[in-house]
């Protein structure tokens, strides 16, 4: 086994996380690497966040390729929602009954509103105000973080 490519920082983070869980008596049940202090302050290693079929968003069109994965529960962050979204060659309609900021990690995200397009690529973000009737559109691929207010965006009418 070639261990020369092992990320020492990742191993250190995992070991610290295991020790903290043992000390605090809690188990972090997420499937990505994060450092959660007992104060609630949390860091997440975004490259370790992976989406799967269980994270697929039902847009009403089975050919749409859209995945969302919340990074915090409502108990952990009752006011702000935050998650990872990945899309591939997809455009779908959406109405936001909440405020949202999308920070693009990889690829390009287009937001279409009233026939106009607002785009963001890697390292850029888009703010979408509450009440916007838009289309999320990705011509190729995009991976981005969404931050919503309020946190319980899915139940907003």
From Swiss-Prot:
Any one GO cellular component localisation term in the record: bacterial microcompartment
Catalysis performed (reactions): acetate + ATP = acetyl phosphate + ADP
Chain segments annotated as transmembrane: none
Pathways per UniProt: Amine and polyamine degradation; ethanolamine degradation
GO biological process: ethanolamine catabolic process
EC number: 2.7.2.1
Subcellular location: Bacterial microcompartment
GO molecular function annotation: acetate kinase activity
Matches recorded under Gene3D superfamilies: Jelly Rolls (2.60.120.10)
Pfam families registered for this protein in UniProt: EutQ (PF06249)
Protein keywords: Bacterial microcompartment, Kinase, Transferase
Broadest EC class assigned to this enzyme: transferase
Subunit note: Homodimer. May interact with EutM.
PANTHER family hit by this protein: ACETATE KINASE EUTQ, ETHANOLAMINE UTILIZATION PROTEIN EUTQ
Protein family per UniProt: Belongs to the EutQ cupin-like family.
Purpose of the protein: A bidirectional acetate kinase that may drive flux through the ethanolamine (EA) degradation pathway under anoxic conditions found when this bacteria infects the host intestine. It may generate ATP that can be used by other enzymes (EutA and EutT) in the eut pathway. Might serve as an assembly hub for bacterial microcompartment (BMC) shell proteins. Overexpression in E.coli leads to lamellar structures that inhibit cell division. Expression of the eut operon may allow this bacteria to use EA as a carbon, nitrogen and energy source.
Name of this protein: Acetate kinase EutQ
Organism listed in the record: Clostridioides difficile (strain 630) (Peptoclostridium difficile)
